[in-house]
Amino acid sequence: MALEGLRKKYKTRQELVKALTPKRRSIHLNSNGHSNGTPCSNADVLAHIKHFLSLAANSLEQHQQPISIVFQNKKKKGDTSSPDIHTTLDFPLNGPHLCTHQFKLKRCAILLNLLKVVMEKLPLGKNTTVRDIFYSNVELFQRQANVVQWLDVIRFNFKLSPRKSLNIIPAQKGLVYSPFPIDIYDNILTCENEPKMQKQTIFPGKPCLIPFFQDDAVIKLGTTSMCNIVIVEKEAVFTKLVNNYHKLSTNTMLITGKGFPDFLTRLFLKKLEQYCSKLISDCSIFTDADPYGISIALNYTHSNERNAYICTMANYKGIRITQVLAQNNEVHNKSIQLLSLNQRDYSLAKNLIASLTANSWDIATSPLKNVIIECQREIFFQKKAEMNEIDARIFEYK
């Protein structure tokens, strides 16, 4: 129809613009065959992603028809009454939105890129880390958090577990050193969606990254003797203990989360507690004598996130500010520098005390009594200290 004819048919500018705007094709990310809540298999995920990308390519390349990508978002925790939340991404943009909604184009590009990555990686049956995907296109993703966010969107729409799918895993962070072998038996799904038992071994006598494994894995220790577990905050302290391992008690396993532990380090400890507790005589956490060290220790034992990974056998043993003061008073020991608490440290210590005493004002009977007292002492002395030069005797077990 000629423009003159359109102008006669549509009297207003708004009607004319609407008539000239091409109709969009809606493409849904979630699989209709699994709307009942059952998770998709790897084969189903691959088939649906290929179909999804094929529809998008045909619309854009062959029909010059813009598309609208529709997907579900997670509801807030505890929200069961509100309807499902759907988000729509339009591509390409036109009209006044072309300049003002550039961020939507980036979202669409990230989602399509990740779907392509999943389609390429999933048939290989090998794990890929979020970090590797991020560095494959830093300009597009900008932050690793964006990769994690959109992978969660893909997993949620296919009803997949956050940790058990797509063969894309977080980069390993935690380190372990063991004087005996540790075997991890893991059930994995092949590309044909068939279960397969996989055995991974942490070899003795050298530090290594905690390997990735699923939530239902089983861990077995290659020893029949009782052992101890020492968890330290920093990699530097971990390395120092490994280099001076002869000073520690025999059969001591060393672990570090390199700061705040990732889920894999916490899951590893939880599995040790679940399957090997009869062989573990003691499990101790050592961090810096500062509020952040205490917060890191609580991440292992009393974290509000993912309670399934809490390790109840782990005990906070310090270092405590009083231990540092005692070591500085001894003649033959190297003095440890005491640092002043800054405002941020003070606020964190105060908030920790408030949260730990929220349900009980009776500190004397609290299971976290030692942690609360340590926070109070650090506030009282207005001092903190790092554990790098602490006397190695505190790690010994008699």
Curated annotation (Swiss-Prot):
Q: What is its main location?
A: nucleus
Describe the effect of Y135F.
Loss of activity
Residue spans making up a coiled coil are none
Q: Which domain of life is it from?
A: Eukaryota
> Per its record, what are the GO molecular function terms?
ATP binding; chromatin binding; DNA binding; DNA end binding; DNA topoisomerase type II (double strand cut, ATP-hydrolyzing) activity; metal ion binding
Q: Name one GO cellular component term.
A: site of double-strand break
Q: Which UniProt keyword terms apply here?
A: Chromosome, DNA-binding, Isomerase, Magnesium, Meiosis, Metal-binding, Nucleus, Sporulation, Topoisomerase
According to its UniProt entry, this protein's organism is: Saccharomyces cerevisiae (strain ATCC 204508 / S288c) (Baker's yeast)
Q: Which reaction does it catalyse?
A: ATP-dependent breakage, passage and rejoining of double-stranded DNA
- What does the UniProt record say this protein does? Required for meiotic recombination. Mediates DNA cleavage that forms the double-strand breaks (DSB) that initiate meiotic recombination. The action of SPO11 is important in setting off a regulatory chain of events encompassing 5' to 3' resection. When there are no SPO11-DSBs, resection of a site specific VDE-DSB takes place but it is faster than in wild-type meiosis and increases the risk of uncovering flanking homology.
What is a biological process (GO) this protein takes part in? sporulation resulting in formation of a cellular spore
Return the EC number.
5.6.2.2
Against Pfam families, the record matches this protein to: TOP6A-Spo11_Toprim, TP6A_N
This chain's protein is named: Meiosis-specific protein SPO11
Q: Give every Topo IIA-type catalytic domain span.
A: 40-175
The prosthetic group or cofactor this protein requires is:
Mg(2+)
- EC top class named in words: isomerase
Entry's SUPFAM superfamilies? DNA topoisomerase IV, alpha subunit
Residue numbers binding Mg(2+): E233, D288
Q: Give the family per the record.
A: Belongs to the TOP6A family.
Q: Where is the active site?
A: Y135
The record's subcellular locations are: Nucleus; Chromosome
